């Protein structure tokens, strides 16, 4: 299958992947190019920034969660019809599971999808040393698929010399540069970048970034690289017909500023299987929707809205009544926190929550676990 595509990667986290991926998407939209966007790995937040730029959902490509065929299926399904599919990598290019393998890394996604990779190189405090850095990444794997670099945080007066040096000594193309743009920096917190909605100037930042990239990055060259990507391997046709319910199943989906971490493909899969997803807001609605067969509480930042969630007594009561009555429910991350007795915010104040589950959630000041886990099927309670 012909599907133009590139993967934007870097040597490490914090090198500018998300910022430059969004800038490239914005520059393409400014040129009336129609991109589809993807994020390698399980990150919820970076796809929100992609969506802010292109106006449609961004999708996750995760070989640990979906397997190789699943990754290709998601790419094919959501990239078909776009002028180009732009994938944003995760962490360093080769960084995978447990920090000791390349499984589920950005490289793994490039390998599975046979996608050319363009590396963002953070040039702050770097000149000649850029060459051995690039060479190391090129030759670490025989099939590295790295076809070019974009130089980030580089002085314009250094660009010509850096471009020539890198192209002559490494043999790969330099597709442009981006200067230091402090006014376009994206702020972070413990789970990653702050959400796009939290900053009123997010769209202005992305517009300025897109305008700069149009001036200093070879968008036409990136499109040509994507056009020359090998044909995407076809999988056996996937179908949900065998598991589709005869009758529509109404499922309440908690969806507002406090609960906004979704995998778009999961929602679409539920709909394909016969679910009607009914959004409701634990922050602002008075009670859950009527005639539901189940409830979904995904993640987000309920701790930032703990007081508002706590004050919505009628919503908490309706949820607890439904769950005590046996309504099926999936709650993860922030959703799980909400169903507990209390959430403690960063000031130390405890706010009563739904109280269906015993326990409380509180901030620890730092991440305690980061990565994948494999669970054995069985009863969780009882």
Identify the residue ranges that each predicted region occupies.
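C-terminal and late-domain segments of enzyme folds
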Residues: 110, 215, 244-247, 259-271, ...
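Cysteine-nucleophile active-site neighborhood
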Residues: 302-381
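Residues that mark the start of a beta-strand
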Residues: 5, 33-36, 248-250, 276, ...
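Beta-strand->loop->alpha-helix junctions that form or flank phosphate-binding loops
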Residues: 39, 174-182, 276-284
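ATP-dependent carboxylate-amine ligase catalytic core
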Residues: 2-19, 25-113, 121-148, 156-160
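Internal gly/pro-rich beta-alpha loop/helix module
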Residues: 128-243
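A short helix->loop->beta-strand "cap" motif at the edges of active sites that frequently abuts
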Residues: 115, 172, 324-327
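Phosphate-binding active sites in nucleotide-utilizing proteins
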Residues: 243, 248-313, 317-322
């Amino acid at each position: 299958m012909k599907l133009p595509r590139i993967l934007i990667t870097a040597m490490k986290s914090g090198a500018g992947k998300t910022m430059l991926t969004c800038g490239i998407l914005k520059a393409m939209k400014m040129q009336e190019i129609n991109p589809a966007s993807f994020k390698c790995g399980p990150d919820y937040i970076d796809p929100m920034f992609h969506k802010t730029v292109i106006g449609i959902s961004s999708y996750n490509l995760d070989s640990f969660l979906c397997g190789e065929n699943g990754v290709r299926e998601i790419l094919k399904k959501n990239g078909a019809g776009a002028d180009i599919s732009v994938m944003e990598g995760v962490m360093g290019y080769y960084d995978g599971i447990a920090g000791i393998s390349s499984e589920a890394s950005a490289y793994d996604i490039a390998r599975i999808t046979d996608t050319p990779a363009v590396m963002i190189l953070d040039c702050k405090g770097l000149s000649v040393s850029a060459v051995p850095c690039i060479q190391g990444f090129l030759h670490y794997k025989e099939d590295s698929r790295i076809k070019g670099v974009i130089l980030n945080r580089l002085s314009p007066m250094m660009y010509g010399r850096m471009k020539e040096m890198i192209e002559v000594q490494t043999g790969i193309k330099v597709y442009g540069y981006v200067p230091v743009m402090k006014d376009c920096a994206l702020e972070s917190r413990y789970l990653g970048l702050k959400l796009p909605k939290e900053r009123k100037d997010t769209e202005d930042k992305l517009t300025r970034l897109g305008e700069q990239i149009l001036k200093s990055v070879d968008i036409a060259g990136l499109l040509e690289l994507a056009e020359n990507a090998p044909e995407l391997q076809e999988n056996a046709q996937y179908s949900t017909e065998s598991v589709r319910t005869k009758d529509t199943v109404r499922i309440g989906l908690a969806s507002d500023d406090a609960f906004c971490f979704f995998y778009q493909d999961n929602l679409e899969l539920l709909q394909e299987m016969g679910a009607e997803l009914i959004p409701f807001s634990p922050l602002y609605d008075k009670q859950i929707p009527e005639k539901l067969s189940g409830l979904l509480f995904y993640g987000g930042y309920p701790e930032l809205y703990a007081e508002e969630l706590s004050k919505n007594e009628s919503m908490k009561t309706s949820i607890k009544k439904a769950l005590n009555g046996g309504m099926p429910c999936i709650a993860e991350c922030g959703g799980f926190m909400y169903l507990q007795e209390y959430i403690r915010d960063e000031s130390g104040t405890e706010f009563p929550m739904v109280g269906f589950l015993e326990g409380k959630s509180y901030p620890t000041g730092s991440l305690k676990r980061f990565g994948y886990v494999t669970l054995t099927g069985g009863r969780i309670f009882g």
